[in-house]
Amino acid sequence: MVVATTIALYASPASTVCSTAHQINAHISCDLDLNSRSSSASSSTSSPTIGGLSLLFSGASVKSSSSSSSSHPSVGEELASIRHDRSEDRTLSGSFCYSPSKFIGSSYLKRDHQSPVSVLHGPISSGNSPPMRISRDRNLDGGSALRVGSSRLFNGFVRKAIGSCVDYDTDSVLVDEQLPFTMDDGFEGERRQPYARDLLRRAQLKHKIFEDESVIKAFYEAEKAHRGQMRATGDPYLQHCVETAMLLADIGANSTVVVAGILHDTLDDSFMSYDYILRTFGSGVADLVEGVSKLSQLSKLARENNTACKTVEADRLHTMFLAMADARAVLIKLADRLHNMMTLYALPPVKRQRFAKETLEIFAPLANRLGISSWKVKLENLCFKHLHPDQHHEMSDMLEDSFDEAMITSAIEKLEQALKKEGISYHVVSGRHKSLYSIYCKMLKKKLTMDEIHDIHGLRLIVDNEKDCYKALGVVHKLWSEVPGKLKDYISHPKFNGYQSLHTVVMGDGTIPLEVQIRTKEMHLQAEFGFAAHWRYKEGDCKHSSFVLQMVEWARWVVTWHFETMSKDGSSICSSEPLCSFPSHAEDCPFSYKPSGNQEGPVYVIVIENEKMTVQEFPENSTVSDLLRRAGPGSSRWSMYSIPAKEELRPRLNQTPVSDLKCKLKMGDVVELTPAIPDKSLTEYREEIQRMYDRGLAFSRPHRAATGTMVGWGS
């Protein structure tokens, strides 16, 4: 059966973007259908029937799984497992840093930071395995399992997008042998499985939030839901859920988000339903889990239809991700995708390539829009490894051979001494390397060799305040000669995702250029964690409340998309100035957050016809009738026939038959356009009708003539 599905949404401020009157009831298959799972009592093992999008929304879930092992980092990969501590220095420097006081020799540097050159780092990973020494021959292991869930469209998305999220700290330390809540008798006696207890203990050692009562409860509920389900590598599926939640904890997510991260896959293939999660954990968690499921639905449709290869459609899909969901649901989906990318090896090469392509074109730019550079860098480098393995291996070797650790260590010591002499206090001075994928892109774009790129090696300095940033810049230029034209002031002129920092390139000791980045603690947290930055610091440590930060970040995502679209049309994003300075918007800013404002602007629609998806743009206030007219005469399926398309199609809006074709398309609506006649038989039926009509016409002409004569004669 031919099914056309449309998802309509506005690329406009997030004030009323989600209407609870337009809900989606969907139980759909997972993102990846290759990785097998063992059967369990709590999940169906039936295979989905291939037969159109209606089955996609209501049929059995496809079971998929993949290894959650994240303990196999690769040379040149920034997503390797890195041990995480809670110290301020590690938070500020992330995995980009190394300092003489901490890293005396190369062995520790390479052990603590998995990369081809010991410093090609991404932000802290969720991997719970101990740090391992770099090996040039190490391969990235991993599997992938993405599934989507059921129930409704995201409720209260604006309320949750701007609500308080800071409930991270807890003073209580809970022991899993004495849970402060009761569980059903059947589960109470079985929950002490060694692997589950060990997994929880490892998470608790890394992040205090896993000692929270609600997080422990979610852990054991997830264990019950996924019991018997295994990743393709043989690991329990529960490990993927915990690793996803640990990625969220790495960026400081609160207990609600971490709980939803643990449960993000439960709707699709376990006994859990939206109502079950609602009763057990409340609407906040239930709506987040459902929101992740809806985003997974879009992701699956995009991958099946190769949307990532279509630049304009991919860009619109970015906007849909941002506009459809609670911002925290987007973060959970990104964490889910990041861990699956970290464990991708279980997929066959063809699916691995397609999965990496979608991640590079959809999810990495999405992380960039959210301002989470740490996840963006990780995603890009993993995609680079799987899409271009030969280039990745070659460049990793080149970086490792060219890296001068002694020079970086000497530069750090020299800068620290100069700062102390000038009386400039600082938090961290660390060494860093440009990401492997960024180097690759720069080489292609500017047709340069690796030796001609000036910002591969670098230092990062975190100071107390903005004034000290400029003082420290003067110190840097006194120590080393400045490379002309390489100074960039992103403090006075922030990037569109809120990024602020001073960048300069100097000639370090010898002939190797050295990029130096100077920023405050607040700027660094914003750069690393974007929207989630307010989770990492207390209200008193930043200029603006978390409410304002969330509100402005949401609006900024739309601004970023707007200017990126302009850039693709020929304008330079670097030459345009932001409409408003962070964190407030001008009164006339079209992208400002207006809770009571009306939706304006185009409606972006996903149209699925013959199980093929395109992303199209409709004017505001478009109706189902407008969509039918576009899908009718302009469609190749209907062009040879004269009967109007609306007579051929039976639209369903959010699983409900449409009685009023004047119904307006709104944010997140899903419209199925099903032919009244099965598509397979449609052509045959209409050809037969045409033949019958022609035969009847031929016989009726002489008959009508005779009848006319008789009537005339009778009169």
UniProtKB/Swiss-Prot annotation:
Q: Which UniProt keywords apply?
A: ATP-binding, Chloroplast, GTP-binding, Kinase, Nucleotide-binding, Plastid, Stress response, Transferase, Transit peptide
- GO cellular component labels: chloroplast
Which residue intervals make up region (Disordered)? 65-84
**SMART domains this protein is in?**
HDc, RelA_SpoT
Its tissue distribution reads: Expressed in roots, hypocotyls, shoots, cotyledons, rosette and cauline leaves, stems, petals, sepals, stamens, pistils and siliques.
Q: Where is it mainly found?
A: plastid
Disulphide bridges, residue numbers: none
The residue ranges of the HD domain are 237-341
Q: Name one GO biological process term.
A: guanosine tetraphosphate biosynthetic process
Summary of the function given for this chain in its UniProt record? Possesses ppGpp (guanosine 3'-diphosphate 5'-diphosphate) synthetase activity in vitro and is able to functionally complement E.coli relA mutants. May be involved in a rapid plant ppGpp-mediated response to pathogens and other stresses.
User: What is the protein named?
Assistant: Probable GTP diphosphokinase RSH3, chloroplastic
Organism the protein comes from: Arabidopsis thaliana
